[in-house]
């Protein structure tokens, strides 16, 4: 009974706004973290700011850069329900450790997911770097161990991703679309349309001259810039101005194979003034949020008369 506490609701109803728990920071992680040095895992760790045990990039997810020198290998082993790995550069294979199953051969631009109990040995044929996102911080907070696999290892080839994206671009209805992107899904999750039951992944094209209208959602986004030239950037802020733009926005300039965190609930928009197309890969915990019905995704949209509205469909 010594642990029991009683709080006045008026002073405990919103611990985040009261500063009792830390906000998820808008933070950038440069590509230099994985471009040099030895074979290693580099957690993109915000645990000290979040006030939780780490490593953790957000309260529920951990993003990492994995660098593997050519001819070398390392093991990833985490208590997760869902893992996602995107190959930024290099070629290699990922093999199950202490388990059956065929190895996954990968190259730059490929993406693959791994379920619970997936201890893997990643061997690089040449210098390689992967972006590794998983939900171990969520399980650590819940005090549980993942034992049941909700899906099987799944590979998304670069060619298939680009083919699906090109189909979206060629669709006549995309001429007025605010976003040109493909959501990566799994047949086991038809309701959420997400890549795992927890994780959400989108491969998006940012065309030349694009000025996307802002949108927001309650899931965190751990964004990886796949490729971009100077002049591509994201604007992030708390509120919208009367014209639908983001008020007092902070600018995040894109750098190839760098990552940044878009905190939940903030409006954000992507822009391309570089003269070259760019691509981005946001990873979110939106699979879980969609299942819980807490995603609350909203889009700013300009009406024909020039005014703006907020809608719950991308359009």
Which sequence ranges carry the predicted segments?
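A short, N-terminal "cap"/entry segment at the start of jelly-roll beta-barrel domains
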Residues: 1-58, 143-203, 307-315
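Short, low-complexity cationic-aromatic patches
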Residues: 1, 54-58, 72-84, 118-126, ...
